[in-house]
């Protein structure tokens, strides 16, 4: 693995005492960095989004999380979205402004 590539890391989200079904999700950023999250099927994805934002050090309102091309809302769960082991969530930084020069 080259120095340029980010090594995947993982984080557990969800209440350990509660048991339940967990899946591992891959969150891939625009820079192709990959972070693995172990998430309970009934955990609101807001928790995953907040954890990702903190790790990346960016404001939450600047990130867009997509699963199978559809934007993920905070209150949705992996179960609601039909997510399975090793599914991928894509993260994009929202770009605003800019202007064209003629």
UniProtKB/Swiss-Prot annotation:
| Post-translational events | Cleavage of precursor form by a sentrin-specific protease is necessary for function.
Q: Is Membrane among this UniProt entry's keywords?
A: yes
Q: Where is this cross-link: Glycyl lysine isopeptide (Gly-Lys) (interchain with K-? in acceptor proteins)?
A: 98
Query: The Ubiquitin-like domain covers which part of the protein?
Result: 21-98
The GO terms describing molecular function are: protein tag activity; transcription factor binding; ubiquitin-like protein ligase binding
Q: Cellular component GO terms, alphabetically?
A: cytoplasm; nuclear membrane; nuclear speck; nuclear stress granule; nucleus; plasma membrane; PML body
**Which InterPro entries does its entry note?**
Rad60/SUMO-like_dom, SUMO1_Ubl, Ubiquitin-like_dom, Ubiquitin-like_domsf
Q: Keyword set for this entry?
A: Cell membrane, Cytoplasm, Isopeptide bond, Membrane, Nucleus, Ubl conjugation pathway
Organism domain of life:
Eukaryota
Q: Which residues form the propeptide?
A: 99-102
One GO term (biological process): cellular response to heat
The compartments listed are: Nucleus membrane; Nucleus speckle; Cytoplasm; Nucleus, PML body
Q: Name one Pfam family in it.
A: Rad60-SLD
Tell me the segments the record calls region Disordered. 1-20
Self-association and partners: Interacts with sae2, ube2i, ranbp2, pias1 and pias2. Covalently attached to a number of proteins including rangap1 and ranbp2. Interacts with sox9 and sox10.
Report the protein's function. Answer: Ubiquitin-like protein that can be covalently attached to proteins as a monomer or a lysine-linked polymer. Covalent attachment via an isopeptide bond to its substrates requires prior activation by the E1 complex sae1-sae2 and linkage to the E2 enzyme ube2i. This post-translational modification on lysine residues of proteins plays a crucial role in a number of cellular processes such as nuclear transport, DNA replication and repair, mitosis and signal transduction.
Give the similarity note.
Belongs to the ubiquitin family. SUMO subfamily.
Q: What is this protein called?
A: Small ubiquitin-related modifier 1-A
Its source organism is: Xenopus laevis
């Amino acid at each position: 693995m080259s120095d340029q590539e980010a090594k995947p890391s993982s984080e557990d989200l969800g209440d350990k005492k509660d048991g339940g079904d967990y899946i591992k999700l891959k969150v891939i950023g625009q820079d192709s960095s990959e972070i693995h999250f172990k998430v309970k099927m009934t955990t609101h994805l807001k928790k995953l989004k907040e954890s990702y934002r903190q790790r990346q050090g960016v404001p939450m309102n600047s990130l867009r999380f997509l699963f199978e091309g559809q934007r993920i809302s905070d209150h949705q769960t992996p179960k609601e979205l039909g997510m399975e082991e090793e599914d991928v969530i894509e993260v994009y930084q929202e770009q605003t402004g800019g202007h064209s020069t003629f």
